[in-house]
Amino acid sequence: MAWISLEKAKKLEERFGYPKVSEGKGVLSVEVPKDKFIEFLTFLKEDPEYQFKMFIDLTIIDHGEKENPRFQGVVILFSPKNQERIIVKTWAENETLPTLTNLWKGAKWAEREAWDMFGIKFEGHENLVRMLLWETYPYHPLRKDFPLEGIKDTELPSLNETLRGENLEGLFNYDRMHTALPTMEDLEITQKKRMPVKTSQIVLNWGPLHPGTHGTIWFLFDLDGEYVKQCDIIIGQLHRGVEKLGENVNWQQFIPYTDRMDYIAAINENHAYVLAAEKMLGIEVPEKAKWIRTMMAELSRINSHLLWLGTYALDLGALTMFLYTFREREKIMDIIEGITGARFTINYFRIGGVFADLPYGALDAIEHLIKDLPQRINDYETLLTRNRVWLSRNKDVCVITEEDVYQYGLTGAVARGSGVPYDVRKIDKYDAYGEVEFDIPVGEKGDSYDRYLVRMEEMRQSIRIIEQCIAKLRKMSKDDPYFFQTPDEKKLKVTIDGRGMKLPAGETYASSDNPRGELGFYIYNKKDGLKAHRMRIRSGAFYNLQVFTKAIIGRPIADAITLLSTIDPVVGETDR
C-alpha cells in the first residue's frame, strides 16, 4: 500500500509544530495532541495538497493499566488524489475522544465499536450505544485486563439439574457459573436504544433469523406505510471475539481463525492476514508462492460472486439462476479441495508462502474450468441483464453516491459500483498483482443495477488474471520454492520445540481486495513477541453494511432485499 512520504509528513510537522512523525513497518503515522485532533484531521481532509478525504478505519490501542494515558486512538485515511494513506494517532485522555462523525459518517459505527470493546467515550456522538454486544453488558472485552475466557458472573444450572434435580457439581468439569448472557429484557433494552426516537407507530423487525438476511443480522425499520423513514441495524449475534483471539495466540496459530470470518471467501481472508505478518517481518515471498496465492485468491473471488449471484437472483424470484451458478461453483469447490484439502475453511496460505505446492494436474483442471466459464457468465447475463423484472427491481434503486464512498469508507464492488475505482490490488500491487493485466470495472449511477454489473465484470477480469497466473506457473519448475525458506534440520527442531516465530516491535497495516471489500489488518507490537499486542481487523463488510441505513431511506421496504444483496455482507466478517 502506498503511504504518505516522510518528506510530506515532515512538512506537516513544520507547518503545525505539534505532530510527531514516526515510521512503522512499511507505514507512516503522525501523533497529534487530543485538543488538536479534529483541527488536524480537517486540514488533512480539505487541504488541496493532501486530500485525505476517504475514511478507512478507526480503532483503539490499550497500552495497559500501568500507562497514563492508557488508551490511544488510531485513524487510517486514504487520499484518492495521491493514492496514499496515513495513520493519525492521539491519546484518549480521561478515556474520551472527540467524535469524527462530523467529518466522516463512517466513523459512527467505528466509534460505537470502540466504546463497546474499550469503553472509550466519543464526545458529540449522536447515539453512543454498543455495536456488537447487548446494551446491558457490563464489561469492555478488548481491554487488556479482561480475560480471554470472560468473567463468570452468571449462575447457569444445567438442564439435567433444572429438569431432574441432578447435582452435577464436580462432575464432567461442570461449572454452574457462566459468562454473562443476555435475557429477553436485555435485548428489548438494546432494541429501544438503537432507535430512541420513532417517526411513526410501525417499527418492523427483519431478522435476525430471516432467510432474506443470509445470516444473523437484525434490521429495524421505522415505516410510513411501506416506505422506510428510519433504519438501524443490530449486529453481533455471531461475534466471537476474533480480535481478542488474535492477541492471545501466536502468529501462525491465528491463520485458521481468519477462515472463519468471511467463510465464503476463506482464502482471501488468509491472504490479508499473511500480508500483514510478512510486512511486519520484512520478508519477501518466493515468486511461485506469489503467483499461486494470486491465482487462488481470484478463484475464490469467482466462487464468492457465483454464490452472491445465485442467492441474489433467488431472493428476487429467479430460482433457475441459483441452480446454474451452483453448478459452476461446485466445480471451483472441487478444485479448491483438491489443492488445499478443504472446501470451506481452507487454511492454505502461510506467513511466507503457501502450505503446499500445487498438486499434479491442478493447472489443467483450472484451465479447463476457465475455458467454459466466460460463456456461462454470458448465459447468466442473457437471462438477467435485460430482463424487465430484473431491471424494475434494480435500476435506479438505492443509489450510493461517490461522496458516500468517501464518507463511509466503502470498498470493493460497492465503491466501484458508485464510480470510484478503488482497488487495493492496483494500489498496493501485492503478490503478483503488479505483474498481471486487468481492468477495474466501475458503475455510473451507483444503483443496485450498477453493483450487479460490476460484479459480473469482476468475474471476467478474475478469469483474465487466472489465465496469466497459469501461463506463468507452467514455466516454473516443480522444485521452485513455494515458501520463503526451507528450514534445515536444526531450524526445524527449533520450530517444533519452540513456541513459534516472533514478530518485531512496531506497527503495520496491510490489506487485500476481497469479494466483500477491503479486509485490512492493523498490527501493533510494543516489543518483539509471539503474539500481537493489538490486532485490529478492518472489515470491508462491516463498513459497507453501514451505508444500508442511509441508502434505504425513502425506499419501499421491498427494496431492502435488493440493497442488502448488492452490498453482499457476510456476518462472520461483520461481527468478527
Swiss-Prot record:
The keyword Isomerase does not apply. Residues 200-576 are annotated as: NADH dehydrogenase I subunit D. Disulfide bonds: none annotated. Residues 1-176 are annotated as: NADH dehydrogenase I subunit C. It is an enzyme of class 7 (translocase). Pfam families: Complex1_30kDa, Complex1_49kDa. It catalyses: a quinone + NADH + 5 H(+)(in) = a quinol + NAD(+) + 4 H(+)(out). GO terms for cellular component: NADH dehydrogenase complex; plasma membrane. One of its GO terms (molecular function) is quinone binding. Keywords: Cell inner membrane, Cell membrane, Membrane, Multifunctional enzyme, NAD, Quinone, Translocase, Transport, Ubiquinone. It is found in: Cell inner membrane. It is a peripheral membrane protein. The keyword Cell membrane applies. It comes from the Bacteria. Its EC number is 7.1.1.-. In the N-terminal section; belongs to the complex I 30 kDa subunit family. In the C-terminal section; belongs to the complex I 49 kDa subunit family. NDH-1 is composed of 13 different subunits. Subunits NuoB, CD, E, F, and G constitute the peripheral sector of the complex. NDH-1 shuttles electrons from NADH, via FMN and iron-sulfur (Fe-S) centers, to quinones in the respiratory chain. The immediate electron acceptor for the enzyme in this species is believed to be ubiquinone. Couples the redox reaction to proton translocation (for every two electrons transferred, four hydrogen ions are translocated across the cytoplasmic membrane), and thus conserves the redox energy in a proton gradient. This is NADH-quinone oxidoreductase subunit C/D. It comes from Sulfurihydrogenibium sp. (strain YO3AOP1). The gene is nuoC.
